């Protein structure tokens, strides 16, 4: 490493990357403060869904001043969020209003407004209630949409922006700031009343730059290699792949498309990523949780589905959501059983494969839709946000889902981000194979420390060590050297993330503070990243979550020997605390 991670302070990004997703949260105390909402205000940079990038803040301030000057409607206490699509902006407006009116029925609709912000030669406000061609982002003259809201709704606006992930990227903000410097905007106009009251779900906007088609083809190609032989008879094609500006944006839009197909309370099995859970809880009829994902809980789920069937409930469950494996405890639920339940009761199964990546696991044998954070392993260099949704061509509901997704899709992936993603992902297979091998080596060498009574390490979590190992291995991609194209594919593995639990928080804090790697919210990068996950998310006392001492470790491209030495040095520091306290393993 050119720069020692320990030399970076709170909120400092990975050196040399203007759009880095790796932003340092260096100590255990900083992680706790972040989870309590006390650290973000001190951070000039942060993970894009947690801390607004400085260029986005600068652009937002300029646009807010323009709105105030032009319309005299923006109160001094007003704030705004920026989106690249009108549908996302209107979804944000409706969400903020719903939250505000839930607290005070006297809140008027016009207290939250959407403005069109043009860069380039044209500033005409278009009526978005009708179909129109829109290629500004590809011509270099983008149109943004600003949602203006009162300060009283700041928490609601932040929740929408953080969970649903459709806000503009830092690259798009930089592009707009350059246009501003050239005198090409911004020009501000309010949306027509018809557009402001229209449904957020409308016609699709075209992705005309060839990089989008290339990315879809590449992802579809990786999805061809199934977990079983022979290869799938109905292969994934580029139109089955939908791209988004982030993984959470993909999850949000898939959820909305499913609810348009069947509105009802969703279900999740196994531990679910916190923002995903919040989307299911707050952007629809709600969710039933089976957070442990055990056989007993799946029995309960089966009984619930049967009860709904017998009662003829008009709000039948639309989908079961899960991860493979779950973040951060690396468990895998019985996906074959979920598939059987879905077939029996005509449900969808949606699986997030971000932790394993579709280089390692094939989920199209069990899922109707696979969602992924492309910001992680597919990109691999932690400098671009993106997400995808893959529709299973063998799903009985494929035609309906494809029509719904295509009709409502709105491109939120800026072309410069797409170009970066395409370049980054060229070495995805080889990079993932290397990370798999390094991680398996680290886990094998650390495993015996769990049984050492003098070591405070109490549990090592990794798909190959979990009781659910068989469920994960059942989804691993076929690696036979005799299968077509096998020589160009990586050997599937167990992924690049493992987690460690300790005897107590004092030992965990000592380990974390002495661990010389990058520390922050992301994973799946070319450098190792550690996170005090439960502390960072502020979920210490929530049922069904991970242990409060858990530290998630994402392996990068550094040599295994170097990383093992760093981990062992940190374990020695934790061991000193453990022995000084006279602690014992639980």
UniProtKB/Swiss-Prot annotation:
EC number from the UniProt entry: 5.1.1.1
GO MF annotations in UniProt: cystathionine gamma-synthase activity; isomerase activity; pyridoxal phosphate binding
Ranges of Polar residues composition bias in the record: 196-206
Main enzyme class: isomerase
GO biological process, one term: transsulfuration
Matches recorded under InterPro entries: Cys/Met-Metab_PyrdxlP-dep_enz (IPR000277), PyrdxlP-dep_Trfase (IPR015424), PyrdxlP-dep_Trfase_major (IPR015421), PyrdxlP-dep_Trfase_small (IPR015422), Trans-sulfuration_enzymes (IPR051750)
Annotated metabolic or biological route of this protein: Secondary metabolite biosynthesis
Stretches for region Disordered: 187-206
Outcome of gene disruption: Impairs the production of unguisin A and B which could be restored in the presence of D-Ala.
SUPFAM superfamilies: PLP-dependent transferases
Any matching Pfam family: Cys_Met_Meta_PP
Cofactor: pyridoxal 5'-phosphate
Catalytic activities: L-alanine = D-alanine
Keyword vocabulary terms for this entry: Isomerase, Pyridoxal phosphate
Family per record: Belongs to the trans-sulfuration enzymes family.
Record's function text: Alanine racemase; part of the gene cluster that mediates the biosynthesis of the unguisins, gamma-aminobutyric acid (GABA)-containing fungal cyclic heptapeptides with the amino acid sequence cyclo-(D-Ala1-D-Val2-L-Phe3-D-Val4-D-Ala5-D-Trp6-GABA7) for unguisin A and cyclo-(D-Ala1-D-Val2-L-Leu3-D-Val4-D-Ala5-D-Trp6-GABA7) for unguisin B. Within the pathway, the alanine racemase ungC catalyzes the interconversion of L-alanine and D-alanine, providing the D-alanine which is accepted by the first adenylation domain of the nonribosomal peptide synthetase (NRPS) ungA.
Name listed for the protein in its UniProt record: Alanine racemase ungC
Organism from which the protein derives: Aspergillus violaceofuscus (strain CBS 115571)
């Amino acid at each position: 490493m050119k720069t020692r991670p320990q030399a970076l302070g709170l909120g400092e990004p990975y050196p040399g990357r203007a759009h880095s997703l790796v932003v340092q949260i260096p100590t255990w105390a900083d992680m706790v403060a972040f989870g309590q909402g006390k650290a973000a205000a001190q951070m000039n940079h942060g993970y894009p869904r947690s801390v607004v990038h400085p260029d986005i803040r600068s652009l937002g301030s300029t646009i807010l001043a323009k709105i105030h000057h032009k319309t005299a409607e923006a109160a001094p206490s007003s704030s705004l969020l920026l989106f690249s699509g009108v549908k996302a902006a209107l979804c944000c407006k409706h969400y903020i209003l719903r939250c505000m009116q839930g607290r005070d029925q006297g809140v008027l609709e016009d207290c939250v407004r959407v403005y069109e912000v043009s860069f380039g030669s044209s500033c005409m406000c278009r009526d978005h209630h009708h179909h129109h061609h829109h290629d500004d982002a590809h011509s270099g003259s983008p149109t943004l949409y600003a949602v203006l809201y009162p300060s009283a709704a700041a928490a609601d606006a932040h929740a929408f922006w953080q969970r649903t992930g459709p806000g503009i990227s830092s690259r798009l903000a930089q592009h707009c700031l350059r246009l501003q410097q050239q005198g090409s905007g911004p020009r501000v106009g309010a949306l027509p009343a018809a557009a402001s009251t229209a449904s957020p779900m409308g016609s699709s906007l075209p992705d005309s730059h060839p990089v989008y088609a290339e990315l879809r083809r590449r992802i579809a190609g990786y999805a061809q290699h199934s977990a079983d032989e022979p290869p799938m008879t109905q292969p994934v094609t580029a139109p089955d792949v939908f791209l988004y500006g982030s993984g959470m944006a993909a999850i949000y839009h898939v959820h909305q498309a499913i609810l348009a197909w069947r509105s009802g309370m969703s279900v999740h099995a196994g531990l679910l990523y916190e923002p995903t859970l919040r989307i299911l809880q707050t952007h629809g009829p709600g969710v039933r949780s089976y957070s442990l994902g055990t056989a007993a809980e799946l029995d309960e789920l089966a009984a619930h589905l049967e009860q709904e069937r017998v009662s003829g409930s008009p709000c039948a469950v639309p989908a079961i959501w899960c991860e493979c494996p779950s973040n951060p405890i690396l468990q895998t639920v019985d996906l074959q059983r979920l598939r059987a339940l879905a077939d029996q009761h005509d449900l969808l199964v949606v699986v997030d494969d971000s932790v394993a990546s579709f280089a390692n696991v094939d989920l199209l044998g069990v899922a109707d839709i696979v969602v992924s954070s492309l910001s992680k392993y597919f990109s691999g260099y932690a400098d671009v946000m993106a997400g995808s949704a893959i529709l299973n061509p063998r799903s009985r509901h494929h035609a309906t889902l494809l029509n719904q997704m295509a009709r409502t899709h709105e491109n939120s992936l800026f072309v410069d981000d797409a170009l970066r993603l395409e370049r980054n992902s060229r070495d995805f297979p080889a990079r993932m194979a290397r990370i798999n091998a390094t991680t398996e080596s680290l886990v094998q060498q650390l495993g015996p420390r769990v049984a050492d009574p003098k070591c405070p390490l109490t549990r090592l979590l990794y798909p190959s060590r979990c009781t659910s190992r068989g469920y994960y291995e059942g989804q691993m991609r076929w690696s036979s050297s005799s299968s077509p194209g096998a020589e160009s594919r990586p050997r599937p593995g167990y992924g690049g993330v493992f987690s460690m639990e300790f005897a107590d928080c004092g030992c965990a804090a000592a380990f974390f503070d002495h661990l010389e790697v990058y520390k922050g919210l992301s994973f799946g990068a070319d450098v190792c990243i550690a996170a005090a996950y439960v502390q960072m998310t502020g979920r210490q006392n929530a049922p069904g979550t991970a242990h409060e001492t858990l530290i998630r470790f994402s392996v990068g491209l550094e040599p295994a020997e170097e990383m093992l030495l760093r981990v062992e040095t940190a374990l020695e520091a934790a061991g000193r605390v453990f022995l000084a306290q006279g602690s014992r393993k639980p």
